């Protein structure tokens, strides 16, 4: 399969203005073709952008990214898997986001054609997000308790149950017909 790798180093990826403020990018980006299946793989390895003010040695602002994304598609299904971490640091405060998500669409009403509307099918979701800082932490989990049933004529879901669980409780949304859904909050 085809692939491309971009490597960023401080020696080659630093820009400094006349006031001594610097932008630095380091890390690696790899994108590749998975082969016979339509799609891509994207990998970020410690890709970090930093802003240094007035010649300081510690960054004022820094965004670091690490993780993987994979998309696959056939005429019968689409699959997206992603697992990544982002960290944003502003002065001494750091906020992180960790994401692990899998989404699958299986066609039931005909083939999936690039550039055309999705046919009838089912959608499943399973994922976790964690956002944390030195002061707070929030966790969210998404899951399809029953696959979401997509109807092309409706342009939306006509069946299925999606559950979102977070700190303090969960929300369950149930679709029963085109444009008809109910959401219920269940406290911990």
Per-region residue spans from a language model:
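Low-complexity, intrinsically disordered segments exposed to solvent
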Residues: 1-188
């Amino acid at each position: 399969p085809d692939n491309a790798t971009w490597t960023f180093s401080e020696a080659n990826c630093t820009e400094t203005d006349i006031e001594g403020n610097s932008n630095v990018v380091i890390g690696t980006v790899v994108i590749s073709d998975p082969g016979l299946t339509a799609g891509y793989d994207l990998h970020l390895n410690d890709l970090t952008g930093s802003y240094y003010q007035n010649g300081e040695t510690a960054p004022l602002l820094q965004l670091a990214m690490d993780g993987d994304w994979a998309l696959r598609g056939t005429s019968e299904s689409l699959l997206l898997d992603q697992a990544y971490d982002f960290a944003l640091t502003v002065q001494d405060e750091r906020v992180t986001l960790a994401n692990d998500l899998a989404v699958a669409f299986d066609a039931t009403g005909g083939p999936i054609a690039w550039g055309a509307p999705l046919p009838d099918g089912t959608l499943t979701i399973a994922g976790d997000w964690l956002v944390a800082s030195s002061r707070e932490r929030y966790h969210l989990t998404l899951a399809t308790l029953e696959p979401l049933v997509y109807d092309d004529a409706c342009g939306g879901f006509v069946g299925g149950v999606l559950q979102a669980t977070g700190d303090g409780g969960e929300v369950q949304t149930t679709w029963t017909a085109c444009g008809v859904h109910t959401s219920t909050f269940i406290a911990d």
